[in-house]
């Protein structure tokens, strides 16, 4: 990879935002990585959908997320469970044999990144 110094007017490559509240959260780094990717997708992707209450969500199988972060689907499932346990992700099964609707949540009082 070719590198260069950062100047006062840098051209940045595509990047993910890692919200600061994740730094002290007691979950594995992979869960933080999954959260950052899903947050980016729900805020910036055409794949995000909106429900009847105006809440944005993603409809993906774990396999798709696993391919994005180069992990196994079971690792993604474990990360999503960790995020659910701390209240940052809510999964809703709409029908059998369909992907979960994955709602990405922010801590109350935090501004949207």
Q: Where are the regions a protein language model picked out?
A:
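Short recognition helix of helix-turn-helix/winged-helix DNA-binding domains
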Residues: 1-63
